[in-house]
Amino acid sequence: MNAVLTSLPPYVVLAAAAFLVLALPRRAGHAAAALATLFTFVQAVLLGDGGTGAHVATQLFGFDVVLFNVDQFSLLMGVVVGFLATAAVLYAYGTEAPTWVTAFALVYVSSTLGTIYAGDWLTLIFFWELMAVT
């Protein structure tokens, strides 16, 4: 079970959900976004049982990068951010916020999770700057 959870970083799921919010009708897009944020919450909860370590490591421009590193603190932050993001998506749907606002919020949460699960400085700086842009 852990291999499935660690093969896909949660920020990839949220970035895809941001595009789905824009592409799908309002109700379906927000449902996809709620499921994506709920996935990040559940993933962090389930990885708390022995899922720590560097999971998605590769080389980028000659540098070793770890795109998905899990430790106990990042799991705690992943649970908190996943829960709050799910509540925010449901609130955005309930208040009839424009879909582009929800999409930008998902990109911001996605980059936040990227900083939380960053395993090296290059990954951290990339996602931190992405947070600043969104």
Sequence positions of predicted segments:
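Transmembrane helix-loop-helix hairpins at membrane boundaries of multipass inner-membrane proteins
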Residues: 1-103
